[in-house]
Swiss-Prot record:
It comes from Enterococcus faecalis. This is Transposon Tn917 resolvase. The keyword DNA-binding applies. It comes from the Bacteria. Pfam families: HTH_7, Resolvase. One of its GO terms (molecular function) is DNA strand exchange activity. The keyword DNA-binding applies. One of its GO terms (biological process) is DNA integration. Signal peptide: none annotated. The gene is tnpR.
Length: 184
C-alpha cells in the first residue's frame, strides 16, 4: 500500500499543492494535518505509522513536511527501515527503494550515530572533570539526621510509616533500605 502524508504548519498555508503531487504519484491513502512541525502531537502521522506493513511505501512532498528536525527524520527513517517500508520524498528525489535513496538514509543514520557518540563522549568527559575537581555525581545523601529521626520514630512504635516518612522527608524505599541495613 502507498501512503501519502501532507502537513502544513499554519492555518494560512494550503495543503492543495502537496495533495495534488501525492495524488499524481498514485497514493492509496492520504493522511493530512495542520500542525506546526515542532509540535510532537501529530495524530495523523501516528495513525499512518500504526498502519504500515512490510513492503508499504510512505510518500511525502518534501522532507520538511514529515519531520520537525533532522533527529526526528532520522528516527523515522530508522523506523521505516525496521518495518521494511519504502520512503519517498517527491521534491527531494529521495526513494529508499533505490540504492541512492538507501545510501542517503544510511549517511543520515551514520551522522545520527556520530552525534550520539559525541554526546556520550562529552558527558563522560564532563563527569570525569567534575570528579577531578572533587564533585560527586548522583543524588545528595539524605543526611544522618533524617535517617536517625526516622529510625527512632520507628523504634518508638508510636508512629505509622506514613507519619515517619512525612516527618523525615525520606521515601519509603530509602527508609526501608536503611531499616534493613540496620537490622542485618
Amino acid at each position: 500500500m502507498i501512503f501519502g502524508y501532507a502537513r502544513v504548519s499554519t492555518d494560512d498555508q494550503n495543503l492543495s499543492l502537496q495533495i495534488d503531487a501525492l495524488t499524481h504519484y498514485g497514493i492509496d491513502k492520504l493522511f493530512q494535518e495542520k500542525v506546526t512541525g515542532a509540535k510532537k502531537d501529530r495524530p495523523q502521522l501516528e495513525e499512518m505509522i500504526n498502519l504500515l506493513r512490510e513492503g508499504d511505501s510512505v510518500v511525502i512532498y518534501k522532507l520538511d513536511r514529515i519531520s520537525r528536525s533532522t533527529k526526528h527524520l532520522i528516527e523515522l527513517s530508522e523506523l521505516f527501515e525496521e518495518l521494511s517500508v519504502n520512503f519517498i520524498s517527491i521534491q527531494d528525489n529521495v526513494d529508499t527503494s533505490t540504492s541512492m535513496g538507501r545510501f542517503f538514509f544510511r549517511v543520515m543514520a551514520s551522522l545520527a550515530e556520530l552525534e550520539r557518540d559525541i554526546i556520550i563522549e562529552r558527558t563522560n568527559s564532563g563527569l570525569k572533570a567534575a570528579r577531578v575537581r572533587g564533585k560527586k555525581g548522583g543524588r545528595p545523601s539524605k543526611g544522618k539526621l533524617s535517617i536517625d529521626l526516622a529510625l527512632k520514630m520507628y523504634d518508638s512504635k508510636e508512629y505509622s510509616i506514613r507519619q515517619i516518612l512525612d516527618a523525615s522527608k525520606l521515601s519509603k524505599t530509602t527508609f526501608y533500605r536503611y531499616l534493613n541495613k540496620r537490622n542485618a
